[in-house]
Amino acid sequence: MINFEAIIGIEVHVVLNTASKMFSKAPNRVDNQKINHFIDPIDLGLPGTLPQVNELAVYKALLLADALKMKTVTNKLVFDRKHYFYQDLPKGFQITQQNYPFAKNGVVTINVDAIEKPIYIDRFHLEEDTAKQHFNHDQILLDFNRCGAPLIEVVTLPVINTAKEAKAYLQKLRQILIVNNISNAKLEDGSMRSDCNVSVRLKGQRQLGTKIEIKNINSLNNVEKAIDLEINRQVKALINGETLSQATLSFDDKTNNNVFMRKKDNTIDYRYFIEPNIMTSNIDDLLLEKPVAFQLEQFQKELIDSNVNPQLVQLVVDDATIFSAFQTINSVIKNPQETIRWLCIELIGQLNKTNSSLTANLIQDLITLIEMLKAAKVNQKQAKQLITLMIETKKDPKSLAKLHNLEQITDPKELQKIIKKIFQENEKEILKNIDRIERIQKLIIGQVMHKTNNRANPQQVFIIVENMLHEVRERDS
């Protein structure tokens, strides 16, 4: 690889998390138990149907443009027809944006091995998804639930040079999509799909090498593997004097190898023309206000500067469900460090052990539990026990605390009664060691916690013990 360099460009298809599809009112859902259930005559291209633009999809596109520091090409929203015949496209064309992409000239800054690098975005456009194909021996089965789902296709310039950089770019883009609630961006379920175009050339050479496309990569780690495999294959071929031909490959995660799919001989003529059934519209007329993107890098910096473990920060921004839970909890608790600790370490840690899912009820219960902690109704140990019980029983922490006797004793009168009895039981020991105050404090506090099964509030116990010892010393002096 010393005399060669890789040139990589990436196209990413992102399924937007809107309630309905791009041009119809059909639910934007994929459910393997309900095949061909969420469909509409518009998605199937039935005669007499007219597409309607999903305004929320336009809003999310504007949000992404702001997050990627892009400018809309024009304030006009224009769609085109891309014609090709394939079984997953019932209309015989796809509604997309060819001549007027939604936005151009963006940037995502990545950090690889402590070196920052800008990855430049050429453009992105809105379009509709195709049906999902299922291959069953000699049959191709089609699920039209996905057909018509709102997509954004993000295209980089060929400025990526290593598999590590490609992975870092996709991870950063994914985080931007998640924190701005644009998409769930899960590679494993197809809501974020990347096509990596890889070529190799001699260092210093201006002309690009033969481009090979790699599709169907279902994880960030596999993106890195697939690109490294292809770079090494191309370098070896060039060293051996072989001629490379344009082709499309697929990554097989079972064998950890790239598999040949088809040749790419000529540029296909898709016969683009403006979609006649969607009027050119003014974006400002569609939306009441322009959205402002969530500042991902600022958010990460503030948390890390507050001594939050960087790995926990990554965990929050890498998962749409966890980030949404963080936002919900922290909007009430208003303490990001405590929110991350109880959400990521305690709750999600227990969920992972039991292979359970994070639910809306658990999120609300965790808010209640943290508030109970702040009000000293439970201590740290009790809170951890309650999390386990919340997951097992699906009951709220207040009722569980009462049921399992896990509430902290904070009533001063009740604590004084317990401590007074311990003083009486240990009177000789106390008087004997009255000048060794720390030893006596530890002895009494330990017995209080033992007698109350760690339910006594430690701070209040300490104050009461300190006052009572002061009285004993005053009396005996």
UniProtKB/Swiss-Prot annotation:
Top-level taxonomic group: Bacteria
Pfam families named in the record: GatB_N (PF02934), GatB_Yqey (PF02637)
Record field: catalytic activity: L-glutamyl-tRNA(Gln) + L-glutamine + ATP + H2O = L-glutaminyl-tRNA(Gln) + L-glutamate + ADP + phosphate + H(+); L-aspartyl-tRNA(Asn) + L-glutamine + ATP + H2O = L-asparaginyl-tRNA(Asn) + L-glutamate + ADP + phosphate + 2 H(+)
InterPro entries given in the database record: Asn/Gln-tRNA_amidoTrfase_suB/E, Asn/Gln-tRNA_Trfase_suB/E_cat, Asn/Gln_amidotransferase, Asn/Gln_tRNA_amidoTrase-B-like, GatB, GatB_Yqey_C_2, Gln-tRNA_amidoTrfase_suB_CS, Gln_synth/guanido_kin_cat_dom
Any GO MF annotation of the entry: ATP binding
EC number(s) stated in the UniProt entry for this protein: 6.3.5.-
GO biological process: glutaminyl-tRNAGln biosynthesis via transamidation; translation
UniProt keyword annotations, A-Z: ATP-binding, Ligase, Nucleotide-binding, Protein biosynthesis
Protein function: Allows the formation of correctly charged Asn-tRNA(Asn) or Gln-tRNA(Gln) through the transamidation of misacylated Asp-tRNA(Asn) or Glu-tRNA(Gln) in organisms which lack either or both of asparaginyl-tRNA or glutaminyl-tRNA synthetases. The reaction takes place in the presence of glutamine and ATP through an activated phospho-Asp-tRNA(Asn) or phospho-Glu-tRNA(Gln).
Assembly and binders: Heterotrimer of A, B and C subunits.
PANTHER family in alphabetical order: GLUTAMYL-TRNA GLN AMIDOTRANSFERASE SUBUNIT B MITOCHONDRIAL AND PROKARYOTIC PET112-RELATED, GLUTAMYL-TRNA(GLN) AMIDOTRANSFERASE SUBUNIT B, MITOCHONDRIAL
Membership in a protein family: Belongs to the GatB/GatE family. GatB subfamily.
Protein name stated in the entry: Aspartyl/glutamyl-tRNA(Asn/Gln) amidotransferase subunit B
Native species: Mycoplasma genitalium (strain ATCC 33530 / DSM 19775 / NCTC 10195 / G37)
Phylogenetic lineage: Bacteria, Bacillati, Mycoplasmatota, Mycoplasmoidales, Mycoplasmoidaceae
Chain's gene name: gatB
